[in-house]
Amino acid sequence: MSKKFLTILAGLLLVVSSFFLSVSPAAAANATVKMGSDSGALVFEPSTVTIKAGEEVKWVNNKLSPHNIVFAADGVDADTAAKLSHKGLAFAAGESFTSTFTEPGTYTYYCEPHRGAGMVGKVVVE
């Protein structure tokens, strides 16, 4: 192999490898909760998630819409509960909501249309 070929090859490898170092992956939710089970039950799956302060939870509409997430004001102040809540209804499969939790504590939430059916969950923030 010629010296020129090796120099070009080394340069190409350097350029290509720099792309992998400079591209950061998109931030993902630290926990994902299905709104409605795969079998169609009116539940959050899992019903309790544990995360660290500063992390986020993503709720994804799975089955039997519409769903939303409303945080109860017990154990957290009403302003925080309102900021974390997503009262708009998700109708389409795959539609999602995300909330970031900055303070440690236990946060209870429910699906407004299905609360009476027991669609309630918890986020524990350490």
UniProtKB/Swiss-Prot annotation:
Signal peptide residues on this chain, from the entry's feature table: 1-28
Binding site for Cu cation: 67, 111, 114, 119
Bilayer disposition of the protein: Peripheral membrane protein
Record's keyword terms, sorted: Copper, Electron transport, Membrane, Metal-binding, Signal, Thylakoid, Transport
GO cellular component: plasma membrane-derived thylakoid membrane
Alphabetical list of InterPro entries matching this protein: BlueCu_1, BlueCu_1_BS, Copper_blue_Plastocyanin, Cupredoxin, Plastocyanin, Plastocyanin_cyanobac
Induction comment from the UniProt entry of this chain: By copper.
Cofactor(s) needed for function: Cu(2+)
GO terms assigned for molecular function: copper ion binding; electron transfer activity
Subcellular localization(s) per the UniProt record: Cellular thylakoid membrane
Major localization listed first in the record, in broad terms: membrane
Domain Plastocyanin-like, residue spans: 29-126
Function: Participates in electron transfer between P700 and the cytochrome b6-f complex in photosystem I.
Family stated for the protein in its record: Belongs to the plastocyanin family.
UniProt-listed NCBIfam families: cyanin_plasto
Protein name per its UniProtKB record: Plastocyanin
Organism of origin: Synechocystis sp. (strain ATCC 27184 / PCC 6803 / Kazusa)
